[in-house]
Amino acid sequence: MIDPSARVHATADIEPDVSVGQGTSIWHRVQVRTGATIGADCVIGRDAFIDTGVTIGNRVKIQNAALVYHGVTVEDGVFIGPGAILTNDRYPRAITSSGDLARAEDWAVTPITLRYGSSIGAGAVVVAGVEVGRFAMAGAGAVVTRSVPNHALVAGSPARRIGWVCACGMRLVDGNGDPAPADPDRYAARTGLACPNCGRVYAYVPDAESLEERSGPRQGAPA
């Protein structure tokens, strides 16, 4: 069902049995396949592809020409940059070992989950089987081959953790005001990773290898 308040461009290809939530915008030449669910107040940019069975939460932005394949779950507030690709097959082949054309039953979907508030940069590739944590960020062009902890900043090919980011998107700094380095061992006893933009403060959680917010934004700062 497409909510009456949703805006769907005339050139978009929306297959049957698709759910589109209130206030969502779907732009030029987007293809959304059968069984996909798109939540409320989302923006799906031109030439994006949403495969069958994909689940997209609320307030998600998927930019132009992004490809989101079967088996992907996108939680609320996620950003997927232009040209990003979210795959679903760790061992892709066009044919079977006997040389026959591979059919649907010859392969298994390996899911991807993008957690609340996470961001995937322009042209990044997320490999099947990966989970990207809450408010984590993959830089432009990254090839993400393993799961990313909450608030981690990863970049490169294959992607490696290079730092940590705030819920507002800014890179966190240490007590000296320098960009917080990636090495988690340096945070085992530290409670003062701060955001220079909004003032939130985070602590490293060794067991989870991720960050936990300890105090909210300062008064009058961007939320």
How would you label these PLM feature ranges?
Residues I2-S97, A102-A155, A159-R161:
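Structural signal for interior beta-strand "rungs" in well-ordered beta-sheet cores
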Residues R146, G163-M170:
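Solvent-exposed, charged amphipathic helical/linker segments at domain boundaries
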Residues R161-W164, L193:
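Cys/His-enriched microdomains
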Residues C166, C195-C198:
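Short cysteine-rich clusters marking metal-coordination/redox-active sites
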Residues G169-L172, V201:
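Cys/His-rich metal-chelating microdomains
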Residues D174-G175, A203-V205:
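Short, non-ligating residues that shape and space the ligands of small metal-coordination modules
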Residues D178-G192:
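Short linker/helix segments within small regulatory modules
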Residues L211-P222:
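Short, intrinsically disordered terminal segments enriched in charged and Pro/Gly residues
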